[in-house]
Amino acid sequence: MTDLEEIKRRRTFAIISHPDAGKTTLTEKLLLYGGAIHLAGSVKARKTARYAVSDWMEIEKQRGISVTSSVLQFDYQGCRINILDTPGHADFSEDTYRTLMAVDSAVMVIDVAKGVEAQTKKLFKVCSDRGIPIFTFVNKIDHFGKNPFDLMADIEDVLGIRSCPMNWPIGVNGDYTGIYDRETEMCHIFIKDNAHGVKKLEVISGKIDDEAIVSQVGQEVLDALRDDLELLDEAGDPFDAEKVAKGELTPMFFGSAMTNFGVQPFLEKYLELAPQPEARKTLEGTIEPKDPAFSGFIFKIQANMDPKHHDRVAFMRICSGVFEKGITVLHRQSGKMLRLSQPQQFLATERQTVEKAYPGDIIGLFDTGELGVGDTVCEKKHPVTFIDFPVFPPELFARLSPESSMKRKQFLNGVSQLAQEGAIQVYKQPYVMESFIIGAVGQLQFEVMKYRLENEYNVHVNLEPLSYTAARWTEGDIPPEELIGIDNAMVVYDRRERPVYLLPNAWQAGWLAQRNP
């Protein structure tokens, strides 16, 4: 297979949703139908002690939530698939935003009963701003929920994008038995079993007037389906690949990830429609995947994927050229040359050494602290710099200190490693050695930080909430003593040794900015 053929078969996408819409369960079922796993272990399956493959961190297994981005790779029907399962919890939206910088399309999971929710709306806007094509999977249709036409209206009213159902549920609300593929005009009836979604479902397929289909669902249901399809054909939008690519139209699919209903038809159609690796913008201009010079960027740092060794993995999206094990690259931010000798690919914590990888692929690099989120690696002869990632100012602050001074070394090591992941901001106070000030977007980030220090570094810590809600930086080298009106501010220093002013509220932050133009 030529390099160009390898690039064309890549599909790299993220799955986004509001918490509890079923994002991680859908990820798991795509792995099941893709042949990457043989039994799905949903976070709901407590009795059998199986957990989602993508939820690999211990706290995720205990709480049944995703707080990290997982990278999952497998082959299916000639495609090399890279799925990035993102944190569902709103407190970890920054990790999700960074992950979206590394994908070529996104799958938006919507709960049939709730429609478009707040977090979905935020993540949709990020995709829209970046021009990422969005595919919609309406989940949980084995439960009572909104009418499919109402969901189409909801997507347009809330998100401002038209939808084009690629399939349509067969049955009555809350009791759907199959889906109708509008392109092939085939009905797919799913035979329910008692396996609770851990195995593939048996499917009966046929035309709408086939005897086998009529006997399974009944003539009345099929008559209602015909009415819906007629209305769709008259009033709905036809599929338009150009509009999908521009983010003006979202292909829409129906199913239930928990029971495997509609998962395989979605996967196969998605791979047919989803974009190949796209061109990327750099400060020097646009680079194409087929360009021969190697380039990539770091979009995520993860400490302790192997807690026994306290390792640190930097996840890189390859953008151009061919990656080969042992390649020597320029680290654009430091100007140093780095040899990438231990590249890995992942199915959550399971790893495989990479000999070769192509644009669209996500690989993990063992890192000793040289790489950071947003960094560029490239060939020295063809230097490029990828555009900076968005930064989210923290809104909650706390003082973090070890319970025992005997654990100070482990404490410093743990805080340093976890801070490099980017979910928590760490600040130092002048002349204060025994504690740090930490900032986060949400409370759960504090809880996860505390949990991981205690369980991965064996350091019990104290977290003291502080009454600050805003952080501000100055432009240029202005010393704190020259600023007017910082009496209510706490002055701390970030990892680049820049002064940061923590303030009680946004009003005082605005007032400080006015007094110091």
Which sequence ranges carry the predicted segments?
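Structural and coupling elements of P-loop NTPases
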Residues: 1-517
